Regions:
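Short amphipathic alpha-helices in soluble, non-transmembrane regions
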Residues: 26-30, 66-77
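N-terminal acidic leader/helix
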Residues: 2-36
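Short, low-complexity, intrinsically disordered N-terminal peptides in bacterial proteins
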Residues: 1-6, 77-81
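Short, structured coil/loop segments at alpha-helix boundaries
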Residues: 16-19, 54, 61-64, 79-80
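Conserved short beta-strand edge segments in small beta-sheet-based binding/regulatory domains
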Residues: 39-40, 73-81
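Short, intrinsically disordered low-complexity segments
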Residues: 38-70
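Intrinsic-disorder/low-complexity coil detector
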Residues: 2, 6, 60-61, 72
Length: 81
C-alpha cells in the first residue's frame, strides 16, 4: 500500500468470538498512537460486516498516511466512497 493524495480509510480486521473486544482494544491503542505521533485530522471507529467480524477503520489525511501505514492495515479504501 502506498500513500495517496486523497483522504484514505485504512482498515484492520478481526475475526472470531473475541473480535469485538479485540477491535475495541486496538482502537484505544490507535488513538494513543495518534497522540504519541502528533498526528492530526485522523478519525476512527468500529464496523462489523457479519457475525464473527469486527474492524477498526481510520480516516487519514494524506499527511498522516506514512505513519498509519507503519501499523500494517489489512485493507484501504478511498474516503470519498
Amino acid at each position: 500500500m502506498s500513500p495517496t493524495s486523497q483522504p484514505t480509510i485504512y482498515v484492520w480486521d478481526f475475526f472470531g468470538p473475541n473480535a469485538e473486544g479485540t477491535a475495541r482494544h486496538y482502537l484505544r491503542h490507535l488513538e494513543q498512537y495518534w497522540v504519541k505521533s502528533g498526528l492530526e485530522g485522523c478519525e476512527a471507529g468500529l464496523e462489523s460486516e457479519r457475525a464473527g467480524h469486527h474492524a477498526v477503520w481510520c480516516r487519514t489525511p494524506p499527511a498522516a498516511d506514512a505513519a498509519i501505514l507503519q501499523l500494517k492495515p489489512k485493507r484501504r479504501r478511498n474516503a470519498a466512497e
